Swiss-Prot record:
Transmembrane segments: none
InterPro entries membership: Redoxin, Thioredoxin-like_sf, Thioredoxin_domain, TPX, Tpx_CS, Tpx_Peroxidase_subfamily
Alphabetized NCBIfam families for the sequence: PRK00522.1
GO molecular function, one term: thioredoxin peroxidase activity
Stored PANTHER family: THIOL PEROXIDASE
Originating gene: tpx
Additional free-text comment from the UniProt record: The active site is a conserved redox-active cysteine residue, the peroxidatic cysteine (C(P)), which makes the nucleophilic attack on the peroxide substrate. The peroxide oxidizes the C(P)-SH to cysteine sulfenic acid (C(P)-SOH), which then reacts with another cysteine residue, the resolving cysteine (C(R)), to form a disulfide bridge. The disulfide is subsequently reduced by an appropriate electron donor to complete the catalytic cycle. In this atypical 2-Cys peroxiredoxin, C(R) is present in the same subunit to form an intramolecular disulfide.
Protein's organism: Listeria monocytogenes serotype 4b (strain F2365)
Family stated for the protein in its record: Belongs to the peroxiredoxin family. Tpx subfamily.
Catalytic reactions on record: a hydroperoxide + [thioredoxin]-dithiol = an alcohol + [thioredoxin]-disulfide + H2O
Protein name, UniProt field: Thiol peroxidase
Enzyme class: oxidoreductase
Subunit structure and binding partners: Homodimer.
């Protein structure tokens, strides 16, 4: 299991750790309009899943903006930003940041995504900063669980994986 810290304090990750080559497990989350969304809703597309502890912090905000800007140049690719923030907070953030088309999804109800991908920080009930790229066939082709929650992910590696997917 990947070891991570949040604000330099060790945390326990809960769920099934995912690796490159795994079939991406389905999950159910909620969009900003309180509608259920699943991974399968985006079948046939490359999915860059950007996971943030809370969208309304500086690193999470930068991560969401950067992936949405970079991926807008990629064909057949969708960026899904997932956190446990309430959908209302995600909607407010998107409006304030001028990203009305960003897809933000909330895992607040039952941590379906977090447990399926092994990124629930047990002590905090937040998701660990991470990135997963799933190709159009549903296979995980890139994973990164950022060792320290306040650090940035490797944007370039994730975008490159999405390009190759």
């Amino acid at each position: 299991m990947t070891q991570v810290t949040f604000k330099h304090n060790p945390v326990t990750l809960v769920g099934t750790e995912r690796k490159v080559g795994d079939k991406a497990p389905n999950f159910t989350v909620v969009n900003r309009d309180l509608e259920e969304v699943t991974l399968h809703d985006y079948d046939g597309k490359v999915r860059l899943i950007s996971v943030v502890p809370s969208i309304d912090t500086s690193v999470c905000s930068t991560q969401t903006r950067k992936f949405n800007e970079e991926a807008s140049n990629l064909d057949n690719t969708v960026v899904l930003t997932i956190s446990v923030d309430l959908p209302f907070a995600q909607k407010k953030w998107c409006a304030a940041e001028g990203l009305p088309n960003a897809i933000t999804l909330s895992d607040h109800r039952d941590l379906s995504f977090g447990e399926a991908y092994g990124v629930v920080m047990k002590e905090l009930r937040l998701l660990a900063r991470s990135v997963f790229v799933v190709n159009a066939a549903g296979e995980i082709v890139y994973t990164e669980v950022v060792p320290e929650g306040s650090d940035h992910p490797n944007y370039e590696a994730a975008i490159e994986a999405a390009k190759k997917a």
